[in-house]
Amino acid sequence: MPTFATPGPIAAIVEVAGSHVRVTASDRTDTVVLVEPVDKASRSDVKVAEKTRVDFAGGQLSVKTTVPGRKGGSVAIAIDLPAGSSLAAYLAHSDVHADGLLGECELHLASGLVRLDRVGGLTANIASGDVAIDHIDGRAAIDGGAFAMRIGEVTGAVRLSNSGGRAWIGHASADLDLSSGGCDFDIDRADGDIAATTASGAIRIGRLTRGQATLVNGSGDIEVGIDEGTAARVDVDSERGSVRDSVAQQANPDPSHAKVSVHARTRYGDVIIRRTANVEPHRASVTSTNSDELACVPSRVTSANRASPR
């Protein structure tokens, strides 16, 4: 298996088709890559594994399948690298599961499944697929077709634009700019300004702690929760649905709480503005997977089976 001396973070580039990829970032001084056929009895799988190129130069690791694998996955790739390394992944009918702390992450996904633990920032173009990230310590810029996106927590501003699908964020600490032709937007907690527009889809802000929310859709419900005691300005309307506003006026708002503003418009849907308790919900890891989801990916390489650096 290729092993390279890497005393610090590196830049990893993965370009694969029909592959299962597992990346483990940890406190280590080398990078190890293991490539195996998913089915060792399959000539086509063996060929894909044999033709997979692994190169390292100038602090940059490149792993590339030169022969496309089958949609179910022909090759299993395990990469162990130093924590803080950046990752750029170009994927077609492939899945990637990354554990540990990565730096900046770039995703180009034609189709497939991505699970990331912690990244320092995200740039993504997704045609279709399912992406889940536990924590983004920085900004995120995401665009593409119809896909599912789940982010447990993000500290920087988020810009998301797509044609459809579903988007969920557990805790957004900064501003959100969300637009779609037909995506449901579901935000558990938002601490900054929000602009969300979708032609057809529901918009839910479980808890808006401060800032301005401008929420517009053609069809679908709009729901916003505002902390008890927080002063709020509410301007909402539905052309063909009902409006339930239990927040509009509060006799004695807490002056220490930030003021929020909500502007919401829908044609075919209900608008619900309500008070919510100042309680943080428990959030499980969004990157949890079924045991068989990545069963073909080889486990992380241990010191016992590493080859000598070359």
What are these regions (language model features)?
Residues 1-310:
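Intrinsically disordered, low-complexity terminal regions
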